[in-house]
Amino acid sequence: MTPELNLKSLGAKTPYIFEYNSQLLEAFPNPNPNLDPLITLECKEFTSLCPITSQPDFGVIFIRYIPKDKMVESKSLKLYLFSYRNHGSFHESCINTILLDLVRLLEPKYLEVYGDFASRGGIAIKPFVNYAIKEYQDFKEKRLLNAK
């Protein structure tokens, strides 16, 4: 028998919200907290708005993390990332906010967010940000040096 996870999004009718909302994120207990898997999540259809021109920006968001006690529920992550659709923010700010929201929710051992945004005016912006608890600082520094 599976434990009660108290998830609101998974298996329910999906109301799509297109205004930034960190409350959409949900987590569940890590079933193997003694292991250190590096989990990769990829959102191939991330969209937000330029805060100056209100033009849409498109990108691929890569989230990698080593969980501690909690893991992100993937449908809630999808809904959360969709909530940026009409949100006006620079690429770098989006990536920083995603990291901060996930760190607040999960309290992971390690987490990184990388955005591969479509070129605009011939320039592609590819922000990277990462976080680590004290025991994973060396890993964080190595990942930062080898960021895409």
UniProtKB/Swiss-Prot annotation:
Cellular location(s): Cytoplasm
Family in the record: Belongs to the GTP cyclohydrolase I family. QueF type 1 subfamily.
Pathway: tRNA modification; tRNA-queuosine biosynthesis
InterPro entries (alphabetical): GTP-CH-I_C/QueF (IPR043133), NADPH_dep_7-cyano-7-deazaG_red (IPR050084), QueF (IPR029500), QueF_type1 (IPR016856)
Binding positions for substrate per the UniProt entry: V72, E73, S74, H91, E92
Keyword Ribonucleoprotein: no
An MF annotation (GO) of this entry: preQ1 synthase activity
Superkingdom of the organism of origin: Bacteria
Catalytic center residues: C50 (thioimide intermediate), D57 (proton donor)
Organism expressing this protein natively: Helicobacter pylori (strain ATCC 700392 / 26695) (Campylobacter pylori)
Reactions this protein catalyses: 7-aminomethyl-7-carbaguanine + 2 NADP(+) = 7-cyano-7-deazaguanine + 2 NADPH + 3 H(+)
Main location: cytoplasm
Gene name for this UniProt entry: queF
Function per UniProt: Catalyzes the NADPH-dependent reduction of 7-cyano-7-deazaguanine (preQ0) to 7-aminomethyl-7-deazaguanine (preQ1).
Record flagged with keyword NADP: yes
EC number: 1.7.1.13
GO CC annotations on file: cytosol
One GO BP annotation of this record: tRNA modification
Entry protein name: NADPH-dependent 7-cyano-7-deazaguanine reductase
Alphabetized UniProt keyword annotations: Cytoplasm, NADP, Oxidoreductase, Queuosine biosynthesis
